[in-house]
Regions:
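Short helix-loop capping/hinge motifs at secondary-structure junctions, enriched
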Residues: 78, 206-212, 339
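Flavin-binding catalytic cores
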Residues: 252-287
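A structural signal for isolated positions on well-ordered beta-strands in alpha/beta enzyme cores
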Residues: 23, 46, 140, 238-240
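Conserved mid-domain beta->alpha element of the FAD-binding
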Residues: 23, 27-52, 173-174, 200, ...
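Helical substrate-recognition/capping region of FAD-dependent monooxygenase/halogenase enzymes
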Residues: 3-4, 10-21, 97, 278, ...
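Conserved N-terminal helical subregion
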Residues: 10, 14-18, 22, 39, ...
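Conserved N-terminal glycine-rich FAD pyrophosphate-binding loop of Rossmann-like flavoproteins
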Residues: 53-69
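Active-site substrate-recognition segment that forms the wall
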Residues: 215-249, 263-268, 290
Length: 399
């Protein structure tokens, strides 16, 4: 009798998953990872992405072991290793002289943490997620689907799209980024706040560079820093440069920046760094303002929940923004599997993820101050990888 009761409860959980309609708003890394994790767990998922087409845009991304551990668990290991670069180390250097101040050794991270430290083109990760999702749940990704608003109702949520279409779901997961319209409507009306940092990015064909410049390095000082590293099997070198600004009024993530103005901004850097940033593919450099939001104590309202940058945006200096969204995806999936109702699952998700995401957000801000401060060894104390890399969202305790 005991076995029969236990079996009945288990089957009820399975049926609940199969019958629960989950809508994910946003087809970025966080949304797609969530979709893949949830479809593999047996949930019925639809991803609504506003873009009519997803293309090979964007630049590089760092995936530390806490992120790759989740992605490998989801079966993406071969896809990532086909294009990613595993750097042996990253050197932190004086902006003007190029002298090495600190080395972060990454070549042994797979052995130490049980998962690798990877650098890759953002599109390569996104494409791998799209491909795997299509294999697991054909038709789950709906492009050209711009959600105007969500309205929680009696046990379901209604989604209204820009074209007037209506859909309903049992759960809505907002993975629509720092400018999340769902967060604006249901959680916190305050707009994103400019943090005082502006970033530029570009890609360089490594065939156009001397071999000794094709490396992972961070040059910093003079209120600026430039991070560069190889992606796409070493065929491209990605760079991201950051400087202080008092204000920012432009809109968008892909604002073309005049190359001469960009080079003038970083003219005080060492010759090797200047050579790298002077040779972007097709002379293209893009800029954007770095924004933040006040910390949000509650990430859910009824059957609507926030994930990734929509919940806890962070500055890029820790290299953990995408990793935290990936962790969110796995933890939220586990919570929905374990709890009887979405509301209970969201409360457990908040208790599990809130403290860790808050710590990462705070540390990212502190590292920004260090990286754009004085270039010395003291400014890099605490940069050694720690508990954040050892974290395992696949098996960590919930709650």
């Amino acid at each position: 009798m005991i076995d029969t009761v236990a079996g009945g409860v288990f089957l009820a959980h399975i049926r609940r998953r199969e019958n629960m309609k989950i809508a994910i708003v946003g087809g970025g890394i966080g949304g797609l990872t969530t979709a893949l994790a949830m479809t593999q767990a047996g949930f019925a998922v639809t991803v609504y992405e506003r873009a009519a087409q997803l293309t090979d845009q964007g630049a590089g991304i760092t995936l530390a072991p806490n992120a790759t551990r989740v992605l490998y668990h989801l079966g993406l290991g071969p896809d990532l290793e086909a294009t990613a670069v595993t750097p042996p180390m990253t050197e932190y250097r004086h902006y003007r002289t190029g002298d090495v101040i600190f080395r972060m050794m990454t070549k042994d991270f797979r052995r130490i943490y049980g998962a690798p430290y990877l650098r890759l083109h953002r599109w390569d990760l996104q494409h791998a997620l799209i491909t795997r999702l299509a294999q697991t749940a054909p038709g789950a990704l709906r492009l050209g689907s711009s959600v105007d608003r969500v309205e929680p109702g009696n046990g379901q949520v209604q989604l209204t799209f820009a074209d007037g279409r209506l859909e309903t779901a049992d759960v809505v997961i907002a993975a629509d980024g720092i400018r999340s319209s769902i967060r604006e409507a249901l959680f916190h009306p305050a707009p994103p706040v400019f943090t005082g940092f502006v970033a530029w990015r570009g890609l360089v064909d490594t065939a156009d560079l001397p071999a000794h410049l094709c490396e992972s390095a961070v040059a910093f000082g003079q209120g600026r820093h430039i991070n560069r590293y190889l992606v796409r099997r070493g065929e491209l070198l990605n760079f991201v440069a950051v400087a202080h600004r008092n204000q920012w009024e432009e809109e968008g993530w892909f604002i073309p920046a005049p190359l001469d103005e960009f080079l003038e901004e970083f003219s005080g850097f060492d010759e090797g760094t200047r050579t790298v940033i002077s040779r972007p593919v097709q002379g293209q450099v893009f800029k954007w303002g770095l924004f933040g939001r006040p910390w949000l104590e509650e990430w859910s309202s009824g059957r609507v929940v926030l994930l990734g940058d929509a919940a806890h945006p962070m500055l890029p200096f820790l290299g953990q923004g995408a990793a935290n969204a990936i962790e969110d995806a796995m933890i939220l999936t586990r919570c929905l599997k374990s709890e009887a109702t979405p509301e209970q699952a969201f409360a457990l998700y908040q208790r599990t993820r809130g403290p860790r995401a808050r710590a990462a957000t705070d540390e990212a801000a502190k590292r920004g101050d260090r990286y754009l401060g004085e270039p010395d060894a003291d400014s890099l104390k605490g940069n050694e990888p720690g508990a954040e890399y050892a974290y395992d969202a696949v098996s960590a305790p919930l709650g």
